Amino acid sequence: MSLSDFYVTGTDTGIGKTFVSCILLHMLRGRGQRAVGMKPVASGCTYSDTGWRNEDALALQAASDPTPAYDLINPYALPAAVAPEIAAIEAGVTVALEPLSASFTQLRAQADVVVVEGVGGWATPLNATFDQATLVRALEIPVVLVVGLRLGCMNHARLSTAAIMADGLRCIGWIANTIDPHMARIEENLALLRQRLPIPYWGHLPHIPPGINPATLATRLHPQGD
């Protein structure tokens, strides 16, 4: 199954969107596709001799082949480690749709697939006038949902899926990522999620200790049709 561009969102912040996106990039590359990542808006950046840099965006850059310029991967790098809308206000920056679309177009010219990682959960806005649904519509790409497996994941997963669909967008798959290694009844919860979510299931990632190379997990994810 040959995939094209898609947007990775999650049921919350801190549920592994970046790590899953890196795994997906390695999976695509393993299939012979040129795949690059994009983090349109990132907060919590640190300053270096090359400018403001975000850890998640750097991870996406490292997982990409070819390797795009950082400014294309992360057009808006915001210092404060808070919600992007607040971070942009503090930085005196207005997040605009046009630069994001332009960067995506340039990345698309370099690769077969662009994996675009969102911010926080699906309903997290990008500025006062548009949210992630607005960006996804502008890019004309579908959505992949990362479900963080922990207590409350059923509610979060169903609400996120319903919100994506209510926005009129296509959700082509969901991935279960174990956040809490001590979560009770993981398999039972996973089975219920597979029954209740009306979108294709792409696979389950166990709890991953820090330092694991995402390339080693590329075979664990299986988009529908594999």
Swiss-Prot record:
Cofactor(s) needed: Mg(2+)
Pfam families attached to this UniProt entry: AAA_26 (PF13500)
Residues at the catalytic site: K39
EC supergroup of this enzyme: ligase
Gene Ontology biological process terms, A to Z: biotin biosynthetic process
This protein's record includes keyword Metal-binding: yes
Catalytic activity: (7R,8S)-7,8-diammoniononanoate + CO2 + ATP = (4R,5S)-dethiobiotin + ADP + phosphate + 3 H(+)
Binding residues for substrate: S43
Enzyme Commission designation: 6.3.3.3
Binding site for Mg(2+): T18, D56, E117
Complex formation: Homodimer.
Biological role stated in the UniProt entry: Catalyzes a mechanistically unusual reaction, the ATP-dependent insertion of CO2 between the N7 and N8 nitrogen atoms of 7,8-diaminopelargonic acid (DAPA, also called 7,8-diammoniononanoate) to form a ureido ring.
Protein name per its UniProtKB record: ATP-dependent dethiobiotin synthetase BioD
Organism per entry: Xylella fastidiosa (strain Temecula1 / ATCC 700964)
Gene behind this protein: bioD
